[in-house]
Amino acid sequence: MELFSDIVEAFSFPELVSQDGGKIDGLVIAVHLLMLVLFVGWIIYYFAALWKFRSTRNPKADYKGVKSKTVTNSVGGGVIVAELILVVVATYYWNFYVNTADDYAHVTAVQKGKKDLHVVRVTAEQFAWNAHYPGLNGLLGEQEKALVGADNPFGIIPDTVSGSDDIVVLKSDIIVPLIYNHRVENPGETDLKPGELLTSTELKAAEAKYGAGAFEAVQDGTVRSVTIDLTSKDVIHSFKVLPLRVCLDAIPGLNIPIHFKPTKTGRYLITCAQLCGDGHARMRGVIKVITEQEWNDWQKAESGEAEQTEQAAVSTDEEKA
């Protein structure tokens, strides 16, 4: 019985901590079921061909092969059906993927200057993962590839408002927030809109502004998207976090976003799913999911440190002058 349990555990899915990850599991199951159907179908065809064209029935080989169009049409029909299934399944899941990101985690919105605290730029290198976060102003600093260096690994353009309080974390845990949505059911006399989604922080701010009981909002069980804006400094890596059902190649010169909605706090292993060099085994990291309050506290602390460091650097330059 213990052996059976071990086998079941070995073939079961890893822990799921992503709101939409069940769709990925469903896709994996669907693909394997289709593979099973194709396997059984082609095995039946294989043995049917062995039986039909056995040497005792056909002692002399015929180089022309099958003259009936039935077999040819059957094989062609099978190929067409398989392609149609592939297109339908791929279209369904791609449509699902591109429509599950909410308006709070779009990289393009951040690039256009919209405040967004839930986008993390992750840059892979041999053999570590580096993260770049927006500061308290909610804006990610502009980048310039020519500025990338040991003292500026993300190539952040200095002396810009958007990048003044950015947070850079090298070769350490990647921090992301678990933020629950509160849906406005009855806005009352406030400026809020019915159906508007608020974080706990935004909810407290609205209650402080309009007064407790001025509107009705309930936690609807959904969470905010977190977007990883992924790239690489050297070779192709692959950002893979099984519990989040996330896997995406990090390609030099390209910034590719991937989003997910974490549902459980904790530390989850990041592995590299591409052979990226002699130290590939060391290409691992940790993505740490924390609560909204912990995220706010961490961001304030890190932005404060960045600001103090910047002020100290300015003071030093002034003293030298």
Regions of interest found by a model, annotated:
Residues E2-L27, W51-A321:
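Non-transmembrane, membrane-proximal soluble domains of secreted or membrane proteins
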Residues L27-T56:
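Alpha-helical transmembrane segments
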